[in-house]
Amino acid sequence: MTEIATTSGISSVGLLSVGAYRPTRVVTNDEICENIDSSDEWIYSRTGIKTRRFAAPEESAASMAIEASREAIAKAALTGSDIDGVIVATSTHFLQTPACAPIVAAALGCQNVPAFDISAGCSGFGHALGIAADMIRGGSAATILVIGTEKLSPTVDMTDRSNCFIFVDGAASVLVGHSPIQGIGPTVWGSDGEQAAAIRQDIDWISHAENPAGPRPFLRMEGTAVFRWAAFEMGKVGQQAMDAAGVKPDEIDVFIPHQANSRINELLTKNLQLRPDAVIANDIEHTGNTSAASIPLAMAELLATGAAKPGDLALLIGYGAGLSYAAQVVRMPNS
Protein backbone atom coordinates (compact mmCIF):
# COMPACT_ATOMS: atom_id res chain seq x y z
CA MET A 1 0.00 0.00 0.00
CA THR A 2 1.33 3.44 -0.96
CA GLU A 3 1.95 5.59 2.08
CA ILE A 4 0.69 9.17 1.89
CA ALA A 5 3.48 11.64 2.53
CA THR A 6 3.14 14.30 5.21
CA THR A 7 4.88 17.59 5.88
CA SER A 8 6.58 18.99 8.93
CA GLY A 9 7.91 22.45 9.62
CA ILE A 10 9.93 24.36 12.15
CA SER A 11 9.00 23.99 15.79
CA SER A 12 10.23 27.36 17.04
CA VAL A 13 7.65 29.98 16.03
CA GLY A 14 7.15 33.55 17.17
CA LEU A 15 5.72 37.00 16.51
CA LEU A 16 7.96 38.96 14.14
CA SER A 17 6.18 42.33 14.12
CA VAL A 18 2.88 44.07 14.76
CA GLY A 19 1.11 46.80 12.81
CA ALA A 20 -1.94 48.84 13.77
CA TYR A 21 -4.56 50.99 12.11
CA ARG A 22 -6.87 53.28 14.06
CA PRO A 23 -9.49 55.37 12.24
CA THR A 24 -9.01 59.11 12.54
CA ARG A 25 -12.43 59.99 13.93
CA VAL A 26 -12.41 60.17 17.74
CA VAL A 27 -15.82 59.76 19.41
CA THR A 28 -16.21 60.91 23.01
CA ASN A 29 -18.62 59.61 25.63
CA ASP A 30 -20.40 62.96 25.47
CA GLU A 31 -21.12 62.42 21.77
CA ILE A 32 -22.45 58.92 22.50
CA CYS A 33 -24.72 60.39 25.19
CA GLU A 34 -26.45 62.59 22.62
CA ASN A 35 -28.50 59.49 21.75
CA ILE A 36 -28.96 57.90 25.18
CA ASP A 37 -29.71 58.91 28.76
CA SER A 38 -26.23 58.45 30.23
CA SER A 39 -23.06 60.37 31.07
CA ASP A 40 -19.34 60.32 30.51
CA GLU A 41 -18.82 59.40 34.17
CA TRP A 42 -21.31 56.49 34.05
CA ILE A 43 -19.81 54.98 30.89
CA TYR A 44 -16.23 55.30 32.11
CA SER A 45 -16.95 53.89 35.56
CA ARG A 46 -18.58 50.76 34.13
CA THR A 47 -16.41 50.09 31.08
CA GLY A 48 -13.18 52.06 31.38
CA ILE A 49 -13.85 53.72 28.02
CA LYS A 50 -13.30 57.47 27.56
CA THR A 51 -13.04 57.71 23.77
CA ARG A 52 -13.20 55.38 20.81
CA ARG A 53 -12.60 55.42 17.04
CA PHE A 54 -15.22 55.19 14.29
CA ALA A 55 -14.20 54.37 10.74
CA ALA A 56 -15.14 56.61 7.83
CA PRO A 57 -18.03 55.49 5.58
CA GLU A 58 -15.61 54.47 2.82
CA GLU A 59 -13.45 52.38 5.17
CA SER A 60 -14.04 48.67 5.64
CA ALA A 61 -12.69 45.72 7.58
CA ALA A 62 -10.60 44.90 4.51
CA SER A 63 -9.20 48.41 3.96
CA MET A 64 -8.23 48.76 7.62
CA ALA A 65 -6.64 45.30 7.58
CA ILE A 66 -4.56 46.30 4.56
CA GLU A 67 -3.26 49.44 6.29
CA ALA A 68 -2.36 47.60 9.49
CA SER A 69 -0.68 44.81 7.53
CA ARG A 70 1.45 47.19 5.49
CA GLU A 71 2.89 48.52 8.74
CA ALA A 72 3.56 45.02 10.11
CA ILE A 73 5.24 43.92 6.87
CA ALA A 74 7.42 47.05 6.75
CA LYS A 75 8.49 46.65 10.38
CA ALA A 76 9.62 43.08 9.64
CA ALA A 77 11.58 44.31 6.59
CA LEU A 78 9.61 41.96 4.35
CA THR A 79 7.40 42.30 1.28
CA GLY A 80 4.10 40.73 0.34
CA SER A 81 5.91 38.11 -1.72
CA ASP A 82 7.61 36.82 1.46
CA ILE A 83 4.26 35.88 3.01
CA ASP A 84 2.73 32.49 2.30
CA GLY A 85 -0.48 32.67 4.30
CA VAL A 86 -3.07 35.27 5.37
CA ILE A 87 -5.63 34.68 8.11
CA VAL A 88 -8.19 37.37 8.91
CA ALA A 89 -10.22 37.30 12.12
CA THR A 90 -13.37 39.39 11.71
CA SER A 91 -17.12 39.40 12.21
CA THR A 92 -17.71 42.54 10.15
CA HIS A 93 -16.67 41.78 6.59
CA PHE A 94 -20.11 42.62 5.25
CA LEU A 95 -20.12 40.12 2.39
CA GLN A 96 -21.15 36.49 2.61
CA THR A 97 -18.54 35.82 -0.07
CA PRO A 98 -15.75 36.33 -1.02
CA ALA A 99 -13.91 36.26 2.27
CA CYS A 100 -11.92 39.26 3.48
CA ALA A 101 -8.51 37.54 3.49
CA PRO A 102 -8.10 36.97 -0.27
CA ILE A 103 -8.89 40.66 -0.87
CA VAL A 104 -6.27 41.68 1.69
CA ALA A 105 -3.71 39.21 0.32
CA ALA A 106 -4.09 40.52 -3.23
CA ALA A 107 -3.72 44.14 -2.11
CA LEU A 108 -0.50 43.29 -0.28
CA GLY A 109 1.06 41.36 -3.15
CA CYS A 110 0.75 37.95 -1.52
CA GLN A 111 0.36 35.75 -4.60
CA ASN A 112 -1.25 32.30 -4.65
CA VAL A 113 -1.26 31.87 -0.88
CA PRO A 114 -3.90 30.33 1.38
CA ALA A 115 -6.07 33.21 2.59
CA PHE A 116 -9.15 32.68 4.73
CA ASP A 117 -11.29 34.22 7.45
CA ILE A 118 -11.94 33.15 11.04
CA SER A 119 -15.25 34.12 12.64
CA ALA A 120 -14.96 33.66 16.38
CA GLY A 121 -16.03 37.05 17.65
CA CYS A 122 -13.74 38.78 20.10
CA SER A 123 -11.61 35.65 20.49
CA GLY A 124 -10.97 35.47 16.75
CA PHE A 125 -7.41 36.78 16.91
CA GLY A 126 -6.40 34.06 19.38
CA HIS A 127 -7.95 31.41 17.15
CA ALA A 128 -6.18 32.79 14.08
CA LEU A 129 -2.85 32.98 15.91
CA GLY A 130 -3.17 29.38 17.10
CA ILE A 131 -3.98 28.15 13.60
CA ALA A 132 -1.08 30.10 12.09
CA ALA A 133 1.43 28.69 14.58
CA ASP A 134 0.17 25.15 13.96
CA MET A 135 0.32 25.65 10.17
CA ILE A 136 3.97 26.70 10.37
CA ARG A 137 4.90 23.86 12.71
CA GLY A 138 3.08 21.46 10.41
CA GLY A 139 4.97 22.64 7.35
CA SER A 140 2.01 24.22 5.55
CA ALA A 141 3.60 27.69 5.54
CA ALA A 142 6.66 29.57 6.78
CA THR A 143 5.47 33.15 7.32
CA ILE A 144 1.83 33.98 7.98
CA LEU A 145 0.06 37.29 8.37
CA VAL A 146 -2.55 37.16 11.16
CA ILE A 147 -5.03 40.04 11.21
CA GLY A 148 -7.80 41.16 13.53
CA THR A 149 -10.05 43.76 11.91
CA GLU A 150 -13.51 45.07 12.69
CA LYS A 151 -15.92 47.78 11.59
CA LEU A 152 -18.46 47.35 14.36
CA SER A 153 -19.92 50.87 14.49
CA PRO A 154 -22.52 50.23 11.73
CA THR A 155 -23.73 47.12 13.57
CA VAL A 156 -24.61 49.01 16.76
CA ASP A 157 -27.98 50.55 17.60
CA MET A 158 -26.89 53.97 18.82
CA THR A 159 -30.02 54.21 20.99
CA ASP A 160 -29.26 50.94 22.79
CA ARG A 161 -28.05 52.07 26.20
CA SER A 162 -26.63 48.62 26.96
CA ASN A 163 -23.88 48.55 24.35
CA CYS A 164 -23.81 51.57 22.00
CA PHE A 165 -20.72 52.93 23.77
CA ILE A 166 -18.72 49.68 23.59
CA PHE A 167 -18.22 48.33 20.07
CA VAL A 168 -15.99 50.26 17.66
CA ASP A 169 -13.57 50.05 14.73
CA GLY A 170 -9.90 49.29 14.08
CA ALA A 171 -7.40 46.72 12.83
CA ALA A 172 -4.05 45.23 13.75
CA SER A 173 -1.79 42.60 12.21
CA VAL A 174 1.07 40.39 13.34
CA LEU A 175 3.56 38.45 11.26
CA VAL A 176 4.16 34.92 12.51
CA GLY A 177 7.25 32.98 11.48
CA HIS A 178 10.49 31.32 12.53
CA SER A 179 11.91 32.51 15.85
CA PRO A 180 15.32 31.72 17.44
CA ILE A 181 13.46 30.79 20.63
CA GLN A 182 9.93 29.54 21.13
CA GLY A 183 7.65 32.57 20.92
CA ILE A 184 4.11 31.16 20.86
CA GLY A 185 2.83 28.64 23.37
CA PRO A 186 0.01 26.14 22.90
CA THR A 187 -3.44 27.61 22.37
CA VAL A 188 -6.12 26.90 24.96
CA TRP A 189 -9.44 27.44 23.26
CA GLY A 190 -13.07 26.46 23.46
CA SER A 191 -16.67 27.61 23.40
CA ASP A 192 -19.96 27.53 25.29
CA GLY A 193 -22.74 27.50 22.72
CA GLU A 194 -25.34 27.28 25.48
CA GLN A 195 -24.71 31.01 25.89
CA ALA A 196 -24.70 31.84 22.17
CA ALA A 197 -27.46 34.43 22.62
CA ALA A 198 -25.39 36.47 25.07
CA ILE A 199 -23.74 38.33 22.15
CA ARG A 200 -25.71 38.10 18.94
CA GLN A 201 -27.14 39.71 15.84
CA ASP A 202 -30.79 40.08 16.79
CA ILE A 203 -32.37 39.56 13.33
CA ASP A 204 -30.93 37.31 10.63
CA TRP A 205 -30.47 38.70 7.13
CA ILE A 206 -33.07 36.43 5.50
CA SER A 207 -35.75 37.59 7.92
CA HIS A 208 -34.76 41.19 7.26
CA ALA A 209 -34.90 40.66 3.48
CA GLU A 210 -38.40 39.23 3.80
CA ASN A 211 -39.49 42.27 5.82
CA PRO A 212 -37.30 45.18 4.66
CA ALA A 213 -39.70 47.74 6.12
CA GLY A 214 -39.24 46.23 9.57
CA PRO A 215 -36.42 46.83 12.06
CA ARG A 216 -32.90 46.28 10.74
CA PRO A 217 -30.47 43.85 12.40
CA PHE A 218 -28.24 45.10 15.20
CA LEU A 219 -25.64 43.68 17.55
CA ARG A 220 -27.08 42.92 20.99
CA MET A 221 -25.37 41.87 24.19
CA GLU A 222 -26.49 40.53 27.57
CA GLY A 223 -23.88 42.44 29.50
CA THR A 224 -24.38 40.84 32.91
CA ALA A 225 -24.12 37.30 31.55
CA VAL A 226 -20.98 38.10 29.58
CA PHE A 227 -19.39 39.90 32.54
CA ARG A 228 -19.93 36.96 34.89
CA TRP A 229 -18.67 34.40 32.38
CA ALA A 230 -15.57 36.37 31.44
CA ALA A 231 -14.62 37.55 34.93
CA PHE A 232 -14.88 34.13 36.55
CA GLU A 233 -14.14 31.62 33.78
CA MET A 234 -11.37 33.33 31.80
CA GLY A 235 -9.01 33.30 34.77
CA LYS A 236 -9.11 29.50 34.58
CA VAL A 237 -8.40 29.66 30.85
CA GLY A 238 -5.43 31.95 31.44
CA GLN A 239 -4.01 29.56 34.02
CA GLN A 240 -4.45 26.66 31.59
CA ALA A 241 -2.56 28.61 28.92
CA MET A 242 0.31 29.27 31.33
CA ASP A 243 0.37 25.62 32.39
CA ALA A 244 0.43 24.50 28.76
CA ALA A 245 3.38 26.82 28.07
CA GLY A 246 5.23 25.76 31.22
CA VAL A 247 5.13 29.29 32.60
CA LYS A 248 4.31 30.48 36.11
CA PRO A 249 2.19 33.58 36.85
CA ASP A 250 5.16 35.42 38.36
CA GLU A 251 7.07 34.97 35.09
CA ILE A 252 4.50 36.89 33.04
CA ASP A 253 5.75 40.39 32.17
CA VAL A 254 2.71 41.58 30.22
CA PHE A 255 -0.99 40.71 30.37
CA ILE A 256 -3.03 41.50 27.26
CA PRO A 257 -6.64 40.44 27.74
CA HIS A 258 -9.35 41.24 25.21
CA GLN A 259 -10.21 44.91 25.66
CA ALA A 260 -13.88 44.42 26.50
CA ASN A 261 -14.21 46.01 29.92
CA SER A 262 -11.58 47.34 32.30
CA ARG A 263 -13.47 45.99 35.32
CA ILE A 264 -13.36 42.45 33.89
CA ASN A 265 -9.65 42.78 33.24
CA GLU A 266 -8.98 44.06 36.76
CA LEU A 267 -10.70 40.96 38.16
CA LEU A 268 -8.77 38.68 35.80
CA THR A 269 -5.48 40.27 36.83
CA LYS A 270 -6.29 39.67 40.48
CA ASN A 271 -7.44 36.08 39.93
CA LEU A 272 -4.34 35.19 37.90
CA GLN A 273 -2.04 36.41 40.71
CA LEU A 274 0.39 38.12 38.37
CA ARG A 275 3.38 40.10 39.64
CA PRO A 276 2.55 43.57 41.00
CA ASP A 277 4.83 45.10 38.37
CA ALA A 278 3.36 43.16 35.44
CA VAL A 279 2.17 45.48 32.67
CA ILE A 280 -1.59 45.30 32.11
CA ALA A 281 -2.94 46.44 28.75
CA ASN A 282 -5.57 49.17 29.00
CA ASP A 283 -5.99 50.19 25.37
CA ILE A 284 -9.76 50.15 25.88
CA GLU A 285 -9.65 53.60 27.53
CA HIS A 286 -9.09 55.41 24.24
CA THR A 287 -9.89 52.68 21.71
CA GLY A 288 -13.01 50.91 22.98
CA ASN A 289 -13.85 47.29 22.18
CA THR A 290 -12.59 46.40 18.71
CA SER A 291 -13.47 42.71 19.08
CA ALA A 292 -10.98 40.56 17.12
CA ALA A 293 -8.62 43.52 16.71
CA SER A 294 -8.36 44.42 20.39
CA ILE A 295 -5.45 42.21 21.48
CA PRO A 296 -3.04 43.09 18.65
CA LEU A 297 -4.04 46.77 18.88
CA ALA A 298 -3.21 46.72 22.59
CA MET A 299 0.05 44.91 21.85
CA ALA A 300 1.03 47.58 19.33
CA GLU A 301 0.23 50.36 21.80
CA LEU A 302 2.30 48.81 24.60
CA LEU A 303 5.33 48.52 22.33
CA ALA A 304 4.87 52.00 20.85
CA THR A 305 4.76 53.65 24.27
CA GLY A 306 7.59 51.57 25.72
CA ALA A 307 5.35 50.11 28.41
CA ALA A 308 6.32 46.65 27.14
CA LYS A 309 9.58 45.54 25.54
CA PRO A 310 10.40 43.15 22.70
CA GLY A 311 10.84 39.65 24.09
CA ASP A 312 8.67 40.22 27.14
CA LEU A 313 6.61 37.20 28.14
CA ALA A 314 2.94 38.00 27.56
CA LEU A 315 -0.32 36.24 28.36
CA LEU A 316 -3.09 36.79 25.80
CA ILE A 317 -6.73 35.95 26.55
CA GLY A 318 -9.47 36.58 24.01
CA TYR A 319 -13.12 36.02 24.85
CA GLY A 320 -16.49 36.97 23.44
CA ALA A 321 -19.30 35.98 21.08
CA GLY A 322 -19.99 32.28 20.83
CA LEU A 323 -19.37 32.36 23.67
CA SER A 324 -15.81 31.55 22.62
CA TYR A 325 -12.32 31.96 24.02
CA ALA A 326 -8.67 31.48 23.06
CA ALA A 327 -5.52 32.09 25.09
CA GLN A 328 -1.79 31.61 24.70
CA VAL A 329 1.53 32.75 26.12
CA VAL A 330 3.76 34.61 23.62
CA ARG A 331 6.95 36.63 23.43
CA MET A 332 6.32 40.24 22.45
CA PRO A 333 7.51 40.96 18.89
CA ASN A 334 10.63 43.00 18.13
CA SER A 335 8.66 45.78 16.47
Swiss-Prot record:
It holds the Pfam family ACP_syn_III. It catalyses: malonyl-[ACP] + dodecanoyl-CoA + H(+) = 3-oxotetradecanoyl-[ACP] + CO2 + CoA. The active site is at residues 122, 258, 289. One of its GO terms (cellular component) is cytoplasm. Keywords: Acyltransferase, Cytoplasm, Fatty acid biosynthesis, Fatty acid metabolism, Lipid biosynthesis, Lipid metabolism, Multifunctional enzyme, Transferase. The keyword Metal-binding does not apply. Catalyzes the condensation reaction of fatty acid synthesis by the addition to an acyl acceptor of two carbons from malonyl-ACP. Catalyzes the first condensation reaction which initiates fatty acid synthesis and may therefore play a role in governing the total rate of fatty acid production. Possesses both acetoacetyl-ACP synthase and acetyl transacylase activities. Its substrate specificity determines the biosynthesis of branched-chain and/or straight-chain of fatty acids. Pathway: Lipid metabolism; fatty acid biosynthesis; Lipid metabolism; mycolic acid biosynthesis. Residues 259-263 are annotated as: ACP-binding. Gene3D superfamilies: 3.40.47.10. Its EC number is 2.3.1.301. One of its GO terms (biological process) is fatty acid biosynthetic process. This is Mycobacterial beta-ketoacyl-[acyl-carrier-protein] synthase III. InterPro entries: ACP_syn_III_C, ACP_syn_III_N, FabH, Thiolase-like. It comes from Mycobacterium ulcerans (strain Agy99). GO terms for molecular function: 3-oxoacyl-[acyl-carrier-protein] synthase activity; beta-ketoacyl-acyl-carrier-protein synthase III activity. The last Arg residue of the ACP-binding site is essential for the weak association between ACP/AcpP and FabH. It is found in: Cytoplasm. Belongs to the thiolase-like superfamily. FabH family. Homodimer.
